[in-house]
Amino acid sequence: MRLRGRGPRAAPSSSSGAGDARRLAPPGRNPFVHELRLSALQKAQVAFMTLTLFPIRLLFAAFMMLLAWPFALLASLGPPDKEPEQPLALWRKVVDFLLKAIMRTMWFAGGFHRVAVKGRQALPTEAAILTLAPHSSYFDAIPVTMTMSSIVMKAESRDIPIWGTLIRYIRPVFVSRSDQDSRRKTVEEIKRRAQSNGKWPQIMIFPEGTCTNRTCLITFKPGAFIPGVPVQPVVLRYPNKLDTITWTWQGPGALKILWLTLCQFQNQVEIEFLPVYCPSEEEKRNPALYASNVRRVMAKALGVSVTDYTFEDCQLALAEGQLRLPADTCLLEFARLVRGLGLKPENLEKDLDKYSESARMKRGEKIRLPEFAAYLEVPVSDALEDMFSLFDESGGGEIDLREYVVALSVVCRPSQTLATIQLAFKMYGSPEDGSIDEANLSCILKTALGVSELTVTDLFQAIDQEDKGRITFDDFCGFAEMYPDYAEDYLYPDQTHFDSCAQTPPAPTPNGFCIDFSPENSDFGRKNSCKKAD
């Protein structure tokens, strides 16, 4: 598979929003991966700080949290859904000031000596919702503690000792994963607060729904834009020489990020409040368009590209299995294009056998774009051409359908490595015994990993113990059971990043204040018909 599609393509945009903006090409880096490499001098600094300033900073931060707890407890007494009193009582203003001061002192002790603020924060009557991006770390809580704005959080967070009390003080909107109707209720609550004419605190929302490495802005969830009220975009920057801030699904874990950040002499953060964005009537009717146009405004301010990757792509990148996707995989782009054609991977999985049989019958015969469109039963479109180009490695205008089915199998069931390999053996295997040669194995694994270059000679020879020049699925399966780390040992023996980028997250969501609350049955996405091949 090719690592890039055909490049930038014009995308229509509402005249009321971003104007003649263009959808940029997929980013060169996987937005869900962060690789942190320290020089010898930086390692020496971390070692020195670990023995000196780090424990002091950590203990002081914990002390400040404990100091803030009684004030937050006092101010959070009473029913959480009761409208705040207007104007605020003097004692509440004092508590609010004290909590902001305590939190700012905590961040200062952690090395955030100066927080640069650009622009003006809008009044609640001007913009009830603040949309923050890019979301890259739990340190993004800094603007929350500086403004004491409400946020959207998972309901489990309120039961955490001390932290839960501090959370309740800012009157967040809670989302319960156990309540199937919770997302709809959350959107309704946000809408109610947003239309209260400033009676409620502003709500800060991270519309990306997950953490990225700040190289681009991924798709914004429409939840923050469904109320159809003006929003104020807020962009975050961390202009540090060494990026110890970024906390993505693949990369350093939460504790390591905390340790390395507190071991820096100084950490920088910039918060820029952009002008309030007032939606047009068209955007009020179409929250997805509203979200897209706000994203373009924020991307322009940041100087980064936009991409249609989503939280689901993040899950694909981190799926467990013997073949973990490398950082330069193009399967994320493939998954985006699948959705762009209106094909939902969760609905396609049951038809994979039918797809593979259709591809097997062609015996490797190449097809052109019109035939590919007929195979998928979709019209020829820009998205289809981009997908076609991913498999047209030679640029000759022809592709092998078997590669498409292998890639689709990975996207539909990313954790089931052997199921994908077995499906591939059925398509590539000889009619006599289902065996494949080294060239077939190379094609299968390159497609399954979404890379254009891969050497499989060592792996093939290790499996082919009898030196027959061909292997069966049983041979492969037996070898995989004996050597479950065969990918690292035989495919990437010299690439240390393959291990370091493959960390499994502890929970389905990256943190408590960045969850997706958009209704699952939302009609605000693409409405292409979902057709399947026979």
UniProtKB/Swiss-Prot annotation:
Record field: transmembrane: 58-78
Keyword Repeat on entry: yes
The protein's Enzyme Commission number: 2.3.1.23, 2.3.1.51, 2.3.1.25, 2.3.1.67
Effect on the protein upon substituting I167A: Slightly reduced activity
Membrane topology: Single-pass type II membrane protein
Tissue expression summary: Predominantly expressed in lung where it is enriched in alveolar type II cells. Expressed at lower levels in spleen and brain. Also detected in erythroleukemic cells and reticulocytes. Weakly or not expressed in other tissues.
SUPFAM superfamilies assigned to the protein according to its UniProt record, in alphabetical order: EF-hand (SSF47473), Glycerol-3-phosphate (1)-acyltransferase (SSF69593)
Name of the protein: Lysophosphatidylcholine acyltransferase 1
The gene coding this protein: Lpcat1
